[in-house]
Amino acid sequence: MTHLPPINLVGLINRYAPAQASILQQLEIRDIISLSRVCKKLSHVYNTTIKTQYNINNGLRRFFNSPIEFRNVQAETDAIICNSTALYFFLRRPFTGISIFVGKGTSATRMLDYLKEDGWHEVGETVAHEKYDGLHYFDKHAAICPNRVRRNETDNWNPCFCPHLCLGATCESALSTALFDPHVTEALNIITWSHAYSLLPYTTFILKRSFLLENAVNRSPQRLGQVLRSKKHILDLPTEPLDLRDAQNANPTALSPPALSRQLVSRVDHGHRRMGDRHTWTIALGTDGIRQPTKSTIPITYASFRIIPEPNPPPIEDNHGRLRDTPSYYYVLFNSVAAPCLKYEYLVDPTDGGNPACSIVARRYKEISFTQIEALEDVEKPPRWTSNGSTSLRHGWGKFGCEVPVSWKWYDDEVEELLRSRWDRDSPLEGRLI
């Protein structure tokens, strides 16, 4: 008689794929990290989870007829999946809605055309918004859904679980908008065509803490109240203002004992940051079937920023003209370098004195663009161009909506060389949570 070896937890996880998937799916990522440190035989659990349970195509299959084709369009247009959609991906939870940012102009037009070809129906008209060139809402109801007849976002309807989509055509680059738009730190997550980035994974997924960001408090007390009431507690986390200990650590005062200040370590302000650095949880997504884009990846992979505490914000005025206190918050700080003589927009941390790119400001490239445009023949100049600079030079040539002249010279090599000289000397990017 053959005796089967006894089955224990290690054996279930290592030898039986269905049991492995079932067990790991029930564990939060911080528990998986703890499990991987129990013994050598379980040290592979984290890597196994990343390989088997973070398949972006599975999450997108509910929204698009072909996830691969959507990701090809995403790569072509530099679109970014953001907000709660990206957070749900890191949580390994299914999502019923998807939020996408894409730069206005040809990229937004290409994405809109694809969505309509894929069967999405635009709800109502494009919504005007001060931060976007346009907000587009789409739905894709199933055949049995009673809401299929809904044609305007103001119509009465019952909530359903059919896919819905929000596309923001951004005035700035999609990346800069994705970093500025969130109201709370737990929402600082983005998904590109090839990678998923969580900028504050330790705070969000290990400590389970969420803090206010500038965008939640810089308008009015009423706006802050709306943010706090409408915020979905995806992680069952209360939203906190700035951690007082972090503020003391960042700005020591005479009231802060030196011994206490030395003991306090900020959980959010990690100093000069780069997308995909050791403080970022980076997941490389499968790219089988994806057409490698011809565009440079440096604007995203070399984007630098800093998340800084604002412990004493000034009071803000309510609708009745009364000053009200403002809770402390964090803000994402970066400078945008964009001009018609640059193919891409670059994000640079202005506080990083060791970054040679800080010595190159957007003004230089605006002036270069101005002189190049002035040297063009009248038929080659952008529409409505006048020498007094009435046409904006804050964006790339694509925002002009006309063909690039044959003689036009690009200066991206200069910026990219500066970025490489700053970051390539650092240690390799870790790209993992543990």
Locations of the language-model features?
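Catalytic cores of NTP-dependent nucleotidyl/adenyl transfer enzymes across multiple folds
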Residues: 18-19, 131-434
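N-terminal Skp1-binding subsegment of the F-box domain
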Residues: 2-47
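Short secondary-structure junctions
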Residues: 78-79, 115-137, 234-239
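Ankyrin repeat (ANK) tandem alpha-helical domains that serve as protein-protein interaction scaffolds
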Residues: 30, 78-81, 210-216
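Active-site nucleotide-donor binding segment shared across nucleotidyl transfer reactions
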Residues: 35-43, 47, 57-112
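Intrinsically disordered, low-complexity Ser/Thr- and acidic-rich regulatory segments
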Residues: 1-3, 433-434
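Short glycine-enriched loop/turn motifs at secondary-structure junctions
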Residues: 4-7, 29, 92-96, 161-162
